[in-house]
Amino acid sequence: MQSSRKIMILKRNIKGLKSSAIIATYLTLNKLFIDKFCKTQESTYPIHFVHCHFGGIKKFHSHCQLSSSYTNSGQKSFKSFNSLRFIVLKSKTCLLRYKLLIKTFCCITYSKIENLSNTRMARLTAPSKGPSFSNLNKPNDLLKAEIEDNEASHYSQNQSSDSDSDEAPEEVSLKSSSDEVKKRLQRLKGNELQLRKAEREKRRLQNERNRERNAQRVSASKLDLAILEAAEVEEINSTTEIEEKVDEASLDLYTPKGHKIVFPNNEIPKKRTRSFRKGDFKVSVLKETNDPLLAPNYEKKLSQRKRDWINRQSVPRASKRRRPLTY
């Protein structure tokens, strides 16, 4: 029942009103009033709502209507009468929440603009023609009859208007664009649900791993404590048994004499390493490889390399003879 209730926002064409003022006015609607309005039964409600804009308080009159023209198949119905066009929105779609939808499609203009310079508070009041919530408790049959009478009166007043036909291009474009926005909102909602589900699953796995780790830590600490207690008890028992069995006189037979007892905590002296005298050379033999980075003749012995170097130093270089000057 709740899903079948819809809100239809009518529009009139009034010149001289900025779109920013229209959208800002809708953003100042009270959420509690919208919820209360959407939960009522099907009827027609003329609504006054006040908005402060550019230092002055203006009173805008809009005509809102509840209707059951929303089909079960989920398609939005577009009607027109008395130069009024409206689109159907779900009652759950709060105007404050879906600002993009309102800004794009609701295109609302207002039929009455009055300056209220002395008013300081924004109030929701009923129009002068009648009370706004007078027919809340009426049965559905009477409410539907009143809606049909209002539609018939609107049709009779403007029979010659051709711009309000059901096949108007503006309505077709509105319908297509509204369907696109509806699909986009559904995709965004599905993506948000998937992200939330993945985040919940991730948190659940992390919590499960944390619980397992904590349980392992507790069990390990208990096991370590039990092992330590058992070792302590065993050590106490073994020491008491040794003290009871071993005699002090028999210990002198087994104590070593003339030998230094080295305990593990004492430093063990380092082993003596071979020290090379100055002038000695230590040659490291490299394995035969195909590595081109090695220097040539690296496989020669050190003595041969030293001998070759001495021979090179003893042989003087051939000095370059100066060429004779030729004229």
Swiss-Prot record:
Gene name tied to this protein: utp16
One Gene Ontology molecular-function label: snoRNA binding
Subunit structure, interactors included: Component of the ribosomal small subunit (SSU) processome.
Annotated region described as Disordered, given as residue ranges: 151-218
Pfam families recorded: U3_snoRNA_assoc (PF08297)
Biological processes, Gene Ontology terms: maturation of SSU-rRNA
Family: Belongs to the UTP16 family.
InterPro entries associated with the record: UTP16 (IPR013268)
Protein name (database record): U3 small nucleolar RNA-associated protein 16
Keyword Coiled coil: yes
